[in-house]
Amino acid sequence: MRIMENPFISLLEKVSQTTQKLTQGVSVLNNLDAIEIGTTEKEQVWSCDKVKLYRYQRTTEPLVKTPVVVSYALINRFHMMDLQPDRSLMRKLLDLGLDIYVIDTGYPTRNERYLTMNDYINYYLDEAIDFVRESHGIDKVNLMGICQGGTFSVIYSAIHPEKSKTLLPCHSG
């Protein structure tokens, strides 16, 4: 004899599970300040409007002469590449001997509603790359773009091949 499952009890169990997950989620959100991300030391070296350029701090001399400029998405935060000391792309790249810069466009607000891709690519990205080139006395940088920053990097490298030595677009689809 087969026992039929009571759909009402099944629904109540699912509602209870969802309520528990929501309660846990609210608890996590209430304690976000206690979570420390982006722990790899960096220094702001350039800014224009609300766009900032950070240089990650090295404890040794870089093994690679040409620095890497990382362009990230406008919506997500570049901190996603530096979650914890043992889960940090930035820390790993530094450990591999690279000199790393990252561009922070800040959170878009209504004030930026008239900015175009041209502004972000041919003004902010170009100015940040020129700063790095001049600081190091070099003609070209290595350019790494992640998410929307990958798209920006591909476009930038096509427009300014004289400034981009190596292009690494990541998840730029």
Question: Which residue stretches match the model-derived regions?
Answer:
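Gly/Ala-rich beta-loop-alpha elbow adjacent to hydrolase catalytic centers
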Residues: M144-G149, S153
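Short, surface-exposed "cap/lid" segments of acyl-processing enzymes
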Residues: G38-T109
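Alpha/beta-hydrolase active-site loop
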Residues: L115-S135
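Short helix-loop-beta connector
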Residues: G137-K140
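N-terminal targeting or regulatory segments adjacent to alpha/beta-hydrolase or S9 domains
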Residues: M1-G38
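A conserved short beta-strand
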Residues: E162-G173
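Active-site signature of alpha/beta-hydrolase-fold catalytic machinery across serine-
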Residues: I155-H160
